[in-house]
From Swiss-Prot:
GO terms for molecular function: zinc ion binding. InterPro entries: RPABC4/Spt4 (IPR029040), Spt4/RpoE2_Znf (IPR022800), Spt4_arch (IPR007178), Spt4_dom_sf (IPR038589). This is Transcription elongation factor Spt4. NCBIfam families: RNAP_arch_Epp. Heterodimer composed of Spt4 and Spt5. Stimulates transcription elongation. Keywords: Metal-binding, Transcription, Transcription regulation, Zinc. Gene3D superfamilies: 2.20.28.90. The lineage of its organism: Archaea, Methanobacteriati, Methanobacteriota, Methanomada group, Methanococci. Belongs to the archaeal Spt4 family. It holds the Pfam family Spt4. PANTHER family: TRANSCRIPTION ELONGATION FACTOR SPT4 (PTHR40704:SF1). SMART domains: Spt4 (SM01389). Zn(2+) binds at C4, C7, C16, C19.
């Protein structure tokens, strides 16, 4: 599993399908967003698409 360096979206791809930025295998923490419209944590993190996200990503 890889995390986007920009939006932190988790994917298996080397390029993020959401923002088209590079991804990294060096990430920690997991945030699963089911309903971004109602999630206070998603709003604070700037997430508006449901999915799995890393809490921290390094190159």
């Amino acid at each position: 599993m890889r995390a986007c360096l920009k939006c932190k979206y988790l994917t298996n791809d080397e390029i993020c399908p959401i923002c088209h930025s590079p991804t990294s295998e060096n990430w920690i923490g997991l945030l699963i967003v089911i309903n971004p419209e109602k999630s206070e944590i998603a709003k604070k993190a700037g997430i508006d698409i449901k999915g799995k996200y890393a809490l921290s990503v390094k190159e």
